[in-house]
């Protein structure tokens, strides 16, 4: 519009056009030059910043807050779970396949509601005492955020309420200076990772590597909807045939189905961990680590650490009720195979999600110190004969929620180096 009006004004209009154009040109030219110079400076600054960031993201091992290669090096920092707000999971097919028949009425009645409050209160007290003892032993203790697990959530494939943040071992595994979030397989545990994000982000900001495995959809195809469960005999037959409630529709695994011995990590195919999940871990950790699949005579495999618990270099507790099919692999490597004593937990004590063999689900503070249940005297004597000092803590009520000391913890930092114990 300005140019049209000026042209109508004759020669003065033309001069005005020339004047305005020249001024506008000089203004634009100056602006472009300044912008270009500013962009160059910003780019140079960004390059320097990125270079600095590159240097900052690879800390020396001694500076990284996350560093653990096995189950027995001196423990410096650990995450301990919470019993607060724990809910009974809805009685879905994957829960049914992982629990014993005598507890099915409990799940049918209480699914989606709190665990018995008195029992939960005792469990909270026990875990607080466990944390205090760990601190007295010189270990830094971190705790997940409190979460309201009663909230119902819905995805395009399912809806559920939550479970708890009691067992960090189930969802987190530390390999070197990397912390890996497992995808899980129970729908009630889909959002369990949220309780740990504050801690993990802190580790990440301080230099740790952080990986989240592919999150499964947990659609119906992940589960064998017709999985036949009628008796222990049925479970034995199915396990022997390699049949589980989870299919190979997509990768899934719980971190507790893996146990570490330096460069070698042992995993089992279970009700919550499929071969695709193990393969994802194998590819992700190669070539620095070797993932081996081992199996057991177990009618209900779920989490390896109450069946096969490595307590030192070349030393493993092997459950006599669930013998390892590949035990010769360890014998040939010169390992010491220890058979733990029969647990003495009373028959009437509720174990809604686990077996009595939580007695061997111990936490090594180092090669010469172990955290063991105060009630399990035979297990204590076994360790004492091995020259290992027992740190006795009562977590009998906490056991009812599905785990022992190893399950209730995730060792974040142990003082040690990457070695091979199988060659």
Curated annotation (Swiss-Prot):
Pathway: Amine and polyamine biosynthesis; creatine biosynthesis; creatine from L-arginine and glycine: step 1/2. Keywords: Acetylation, Membrane, Mitochondrion, Mitochondrion inner membrane, Phosphoprotein, Transferase, Transit peptide. Residues 52-61 have a biased composition (Basic and acidic residues). The modification N6-acetyllysine is found at residue 385. It is found in: Mitochondrion inner membrane. One of its GO terms (cellular component) is mitochondrial inner membrane. Residues 43-63 are annotated as: Disordered. Its EC number is 2.1.4.1. Gene3D superfamilies: L-arginine/glycine Amidinotransferase, Chain A. Its main location: mitochondrion. It is an enzyme of class 2 (transferase). Homodimer. PANTHER family: GLYCINE AMIDINOTRANSFERASE, MITOCHONDRIAL (PTHR10488:SF1). This is Glycine amidinotransferase, mitochondrial. It comes from Macaca fascicularis (Crab-eating macaque). The lineage of its organism: Eukaryota, Metazoa, Chordata, Craniata, Vertebrata.
